[in-house]
Curated annotation (Swiss-Prot):
GO aspect biological process, one term: bis(molybdopterin guanine dinucleotide)molybdenum biosynthetic process
Name of the protein in its database record: Molybdenum cofactor guanylyltransferase
Reactions accelerated catalytically: Mo-molybdopterin + GTP + H(+) = Mo-molybdopterin guanine dinucleotide + diphosphate
Function: Transfers a GMP moiety from GTP to Mo-molybdopterin (Mo-MPT) cofactor (Moco or molybdenum cofactor) to form Mo-molybdopterin guanine dinucleotide (Mo-MGD) cofactor.
One of the record's GO cellular component terms: cytoplasm
Organism of this sequence: Xanthomonas euvesicatoria pv. vesicatoria (strain 85-10) (Xanthomonas campestris pv. vesicatoria)
PANTHER family on file: MOLYBDENUM COFACTOR GUANYLYLTRANSFERASE (PTHR19136:SF81)
EC numbers for this chain: 2.7.7.77
Length: 189
């Protein structure tokens, strides 16, 4: 499941977790924090480097240059600090059912600058070139309503990969204690 070119994995872990009531990145998943689970997943999928978006010194996290701008702001900060990166695979911290095999579908050889799964913003693959960086800069300078992963994917004409029903089940994420409890109950250690 390796890409011909090296790639960098990015875990988006800078959110406030306000609906969860506690830091989602540190919730225990099969014996380790969710953040570590997602880092391990990216390494398993073949990432040469894995970086964390968010003010997390204990994980060498990259703090947002402009706080409170959501996932797009975190991604912009990572890209600004990863000048040598040519390809990023971006995952949220709260999607522990993702598999390396599914991420591999994003990494299939492609000429697309942006690749994501149908009906999903994340995970996504970005092949960084001047046009991707410019699109990100324009969105970050624009109105707050345009600062979203959806807007970035739209501006890059993101290619959508189809998934099976069983693969779709891997996109479960958790934003509330009830969702987390259900996920733990359905996926015991």
């Amino acid at each position: 499941m390796t890409l011909q070119r090296p790639w960098t994995g990015v875990v988006l872990a800078g959110g406030r977790s306000s609906r969860m009531g506690q830091d989602k990145a540190l919730l225990p998943w099969h014996g380790r924090p969710l953040l570590e689970q997602m880092q391990a997943l990216l390494r398993q999928a073949g990432a040469q480097h894995v970086v964390v978006s968010g003010n997390r010194p204990e994980y060498a996290g990259i703090a947002d240059v402009h706080p409170d701008l959501g996932p797009l702001g975190g991604l912009a900060s990572v890209i600004a600090n990863a000048a040598d990166a040519t390809t990023l695979v971006v995952v949220p911290v709260d999607m522990p059912l993702l598999s390396a095999a599914l991420l591999g579908k994003l990494l299939a050889p492609s000429q697309h600058r942006c690749v994501a799964f149908e009906d999903q913003m994340l995970p996504m693959c970005l092949r960084l070139d001047a046009s991707v960086r410019e699109a990100l800069t324009v969105l970050m300078a624009g109105a707050a309503s345009s600062r979203s992963l959806r807007a970035l994917q739209h501006s890059l004409q993101c290619h959508r990969v189809t998934v099976t029903a069983s693969e779709r089940a891997e996109f479960v994420n958790c934003n509330t204690p009830e969702q987390w409890s259900r996920l733990i109950h359905e996926n015991p250690d």
